[in-house]
Amino acid sequence: MRTPDTDEYVGKTIAYKYRVEALIGEGGMGKVFRARQLSLDKVVVLKVLRHTLLSDERTVARFQREAKAASRLNHPNSISVLDFGQAEDGALFIAMEYVAGQDLHQILSREWPLNEGRVVRIVSQVLSALSDAHGAGVIHRDLKPENIMVEPRRNEPDFVKVLDFGIAKITDSTDDGPALTRAGFVCGTPEYMSPEQARGSQLDHRSDLYAVGVILYQLMTGLLPFESDSAVGFATKHLTEEPPPPTRRRPDARISPAMERLILRALSKNPADRPASAEAFKAELQAVDKERRRMDSAPRRSANSSAVLAPLPRKSAASPQSDVRDATLPGWGNEVTMEATVRALPGVLEPLPANADAMAATRETTDSLVHTQPGAGGSSGVAFFFKSLTILLVVAALGFFAYYFFMGAGSGGAQDLPYALPTNAPVPAGANNSAVGASPDVPLYDRAIVSGARNVERALDVAREGDKALQRADVGLAATKYREAFSRSGDPELALKLGEVYWHRQNPDKEEARGWWNRHLREQPASKARALIEQRLNGAVAQPTSP
């Protein structure tokens, strides 16, 4: 004899309005079917509770809770509940919109690695759905890749739907019925549980943000932040262990430093150290992506370009590969050498001359000579010879001018800059004093940047001002801007830049450079710049006490 828990529903009509077409999944609580709503000829999903559970008051209440929680939500990225009712045989069902896609777990299994831009698009939509849910007083409590559906839409190849509010918590006083949780009661999926959830403590919306941090970690690395063979093992690690940085788990993955910092902040044990809300989390995530796109669109020097003059000679000898920039931009997954980072700092090793307008005019003249091709006939060959000679003389003159300007002339030695670089300034001008958590006599590179003072978007804007100053050879202003940006973000790539600025000034400040490079290495232990830094400082890079 067949029981109601078999797939006997397929081909039948439930509640006189849903014709069941196929079984598409099942779990401990029931089965999930694809069905067609007859009155609208619309495909829907039916979740049917098992008959054997109808006598369990808590399970029935949980099933009703899912319908109630999801029905409160009205957001494009949240699954919509269409109906709740009882079948002819007494089984309870929920009718929901049908999503023709795959869940995020399937995407991870089939398509990893995912590029950072795609991850940002997907997770931003998840955070939008959570922001709406949290505003409606609903905490998901079981967010994981299997509960995130992704389907292609006309204007979005990865359109997200967050589903399965089966253990959602409704936080207002209008909720009635039997309590689904009690002190010390733990529900959820252990791999994605926040520490407070694993402890059985009272939860708020920041518990969901921790789960988003776990998902982000997994999307960027293909791995969970913690590994265990048991639910208890996962819960213990969420409670007691710090997650290893994503780039340490996957040194080959393309993970920007800003993305790594955001992931680790979302995984903070203390909810107060995580992003304050889903909306704030989304804003920080999109700021990370904005900077990534800016770096991706930055002009790169072509190794094959022969139609323009080569840049002025460097002050120090360049490596044989110095004219070829790594296709990977600085700061991505620690894949770039220090030399590539130096090349990303225009003006430090190749500063403009004092009379930049004259140099631009000279380059325009020489460019026109380079682009002039020899014509037919003997006289054109002679003309081409003299034009080539002219180019060589111009380049030599420019080189001599640059050497004279930057190294000084005669026996006077190196000329000092007409301004002083800021050194060990505790807080740069324009920065917020609350941005650093130490006494004023502690150098900026040894300070902890407290979470309450972080402003990633402002830091990116200030760092761009520093880049522009560096392009104008205004090294002093560049250093000031980089320091201010660092005080707002703690970005280890800014520490690397500041080390370069102080090391390559005319009168190098090696102690200041050492301080900034130590900070970079402390934040990025696997940095590919380590070998070159230690070589420059003769192996004297000491690891300072963590701030």
UniProtKB/Swiss-Prot annotation:
Residues 290-299 have a biased composition (Basic and acidic residues). This is Serine/threonine-protein kinase pkn3. It holds the Pfam family Pkinase. It is an enzyme of class 2 (transferase). Keywords: ATP-binding, Kinase, Nucleotide-binding, Serine/threonine-protein kinase, Transferase. The gene is pkn3. Residues 18-288 form the Protein kinase domain. The keyword Nucleotidyltransferase does not apply. It catalyses: L-seryl-[protein] + ATP = O-phospho-L-seryl-[protein] + ADP + H(+); L-threonyl-[protein] + ATP = O-phospho-L-threonyl-[protein] + ADP + H(+). The active site is at residue 142. It comes from the Bacteria.
